């Protein structure tokens, strides 16, 4: 039974992480342009690097521009959480929980909510017990 909960938890976390990929992409016309953009971003602004590399900021890349870079945007992540990670990711599970109050479904639903909380707050889970001294 614990194995099922673990598998469901991993599935839920992968669904949560997949939600991040709805944000804008930096689309580049070639590998060379993408690499140039990535190196440029170490020191310069996004706008400057797009201008120099020929890349574009877009939700969808133009045909043939398959070299997309997903931007890690805290605003997009926070917005997703504000809109309701639990509603969008755990909604089907909550419906199942309402129709079948089994222990596995209840546990998976709790894990989903916990995963959303950790994801949205960028927290980590502290293991139980006293801290170990190095």
Swiss-Prot record:
Q: Which residues form the signal peptide?
A: 1-24
Q: What does this protein do?
A: Seems to function as a defense factor. Thionins are small plant proteins which are toxic to animal cells. They seem to exert their toxic effect at the level of the cell membrane. Their precise function is not known.
Which ranges does the record mark as transmembrane?
A: none
One BP term from GO: defense response
Similarity comment: Belongs to the plant thionin (TC 1.C.44) family.
Q: Which residues form the propeptide?
A: 68-134
Report the record's disulfide bonds. 27-61, 28-55, 40-49
Matching entries from Pfam families are given as: Thionin (PF00321)
Q: Which residues form a coiled coil?
A: none
Induction conditions: Highly induced in seedlings by pathogens, wounding, silver nitrate, and methyl jasmonate.
Official protein name in the record: Thionin-2.1
Provide the tissue specificity.
Answer: Detected in rosette leaves and at a very high level in flowers and in siliques.
- Top-rank taxon, per record: Eukaryota
Q: Which GO terms describe its molecular function?
A: toxin activity
InterPro entries registered for this protein in UniProt: Thionin, Thionin-like_sf
Tell whether Transmembrane is among the UniProt keywords: no
CC annotations in GO: extracellular region
Compartments in which it is found = Secreted
Q: What keywords are annotated for this sequence in UniProt?
A: Disulfide bond, Plant defense, Secreted, Signal, Toxin
């Amino acid at each position: 039974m614990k194995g099922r909960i673990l598998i469901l938890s991993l599935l839920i976390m992968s669904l949560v992480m997949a939600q991040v990929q709805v944000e804008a992409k930096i689309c580049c016309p070639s590998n060379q342009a993408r690499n140039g953009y990535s190196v440029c971003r170490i020191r310069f602004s996004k706008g400057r690097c797009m201008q120099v590399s020929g890349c574009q900021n877009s939700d969808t890349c133009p045909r043939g521009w398959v070299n997309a870079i997903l931007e890690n945007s805290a605003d997009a992540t926070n917005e997703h959480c504000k809109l309701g990670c639990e509603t969008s990711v755990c909604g089907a599970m909550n419906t199942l929980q309402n129709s079948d109050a089994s222990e596995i479904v209840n546990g998976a639903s709790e894990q989903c909510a916990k995963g959303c909380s950790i994801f949205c707050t960028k927290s980590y889970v502290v293991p139980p017990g006293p801290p170990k001294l190095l």
